[in-house]
A protein has these predicted regions:
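Single, function-defining residue in the core of a domain
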Residues: 1-45, 64-65, 69-72, 79-81, ...
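Extended, structured, electrostatic nucleic-acid-contact surfaces
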Residues: 41-55
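Short, basic interhelical loop/turn and adjoining N-cap
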Residues: 52-67
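Non-cleavable N-terminal signal-anchor transmembrane helices
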Residues: 57, 92-94
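Short Lys/Arg-enriched helix C-cap and helix-to-coil transition segments
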Residues: 75-89
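Short Pro/Gly-enriched beta-strand edge/turn motifs at strand-loop
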Residues: 106-111
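Extracellular beta-strand-rich solenoid/capping regions of secreted or surface-exposed proteins
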Residues: 114-116
Length: 330
């Protein structure tokens, strides 16, 4: 079964969610409300969300939803995310090597409730598979812990044939050693003041990795890259071109923050924030799978606008789900 229509993807995603596990706010309705909040551009807070829902036929209290965000196990949302990831992986033939840029982004927490707990930001780390255009496992860490401390978790994100591509924030000899011990290939930009020998190798502590230098003539910038990818697999020129694909994850962060509210955390607790982040990434994966009429184009923002127009005909996602896919109610 090939998923490319919005109803088909939603049906595949939500059909197994229970509708009778909670008396007031069942799991399917809980997830549907979150999708409404992310997909509707005019909603910027939970109060906005529930004002719309309560005036269009969905009788659930904001307090009930807020309590569910605080107490419910986010595994049900994680299950939806990994269900889509598994489908995308199966739909793409495996390649010998896949470039996987990885990076961290900071999500500010604006509520004073978080400040009182000592949290002013959440750090999100993931990879972006350049073959499937899908994100990988997520690291969600409150506080200011540096991303370089998540080396082992980052390695577990990568597919077996993945090449980790990272920026200078991840340049560390200890991290390089961890990659080497784990037989994980990497291409990571290093600082220009690092020293290397006459054969363009730097010692990591347990091994040596080669250094590649390339420049951007227009910007007058030189890049120094450390890699353990053998030269017979990727030449210096290919390493330079591979590093340029790291920019794709920066574009991802920009899209998620501009269009899917990654920088607007609506929940007032860390459990709810984890749920919102996963819903945002689920919507991103839906957009990657979705095929829309040609007039909307092939860019993600065009696909998102198409979904918003479709849903708006039924006022919001909850109503659309109940009317367009009634078999999910059975």
């Amino acid at each position: 079964m090939k998923l490319n229509s919005f109803p088909g993807i939603v049906n595949f995603l939500l059909k197994d969610l229970p509708t009778n596990d909670y008396p007031v706010l069942n799991s399917r309705l809980f997830c549907s409300i979150w999708f409404t909040g992310i997909l509707d551009k005019g909603i910027n807070s939970l109060r906005d969300l529930f004002y719309q829902l309560n005036h269009t036929g969905t009788q659930v209290d904001l307090s009930t939803f807020s309590k569910a965000n605080k107490t419910r196990d986010p595994q049900i949302i994680l299950g939806l995310y990994h269900k889509l990831l598994h489908y995308i992986e199966k739909a793409h033939p495996e390649k010998k090597l896949v470039l996987c840029p990885f990076d961290a982004t900071v999500i500010p927490l604006m509520s004073k409730l978080f400040w009182l707990q000592g949290h002013r930001q959440v750090k999100l780390i993931t990879t972006l598979n350049q073959d499937t255009k899908s994100t990988g496992h997520l690291i969600i860490s409150p506080g200011q812990k540096h991303e370089i401390n998540f080396g082992e978790e980052i390695m577990r994100m990568l597919p077996e044939n993945g090449v980790a591509v990272g920026d200078r924030g991840f340049c560390s000899r200890k991290l390089f050693d961890k990659f080497i011990e784990n037989n994980t290939l990497f291409i990571i930009r290093i600082k220009s003041n690092w020293k290397w020998d006459e054969n363009y190798h730097i010692a990591t502590g347990k091994d040596k990795v080669r250094v590649i230098c390339f420049g951007n003539v227009q910007q007058k910038i030189e890049y120094y890259l450390a890699t353990n990818v053998p030269e017979e697999i990727m030449s210096n020129e290919e390493i330079g071109e591979a590093y340029k694909q790291r920019w794709a994850i920066e574009v991802l962060w920009k899209f998620l923050k501009m269009h899917l509210k990654l920088d607007k955390m609506m929940s007032k607790n860390l459990n709810g924030i984890t749920i919102q982040i996963y819903v945002i990434l689920i919507v991103y994966l839906i957009l990657q799978l979705l095929k829309v009429p040609q007039m909307y184009g092939s860019k993600l923002v065009g696909k998102l606008r198409y979904i918003q127009i479709v849903i708006r005909r039924e006022l919001n996602f909850v109503n659309w789900l109940n009317r367009v896919i009634p078999r999910l109610n059975m």
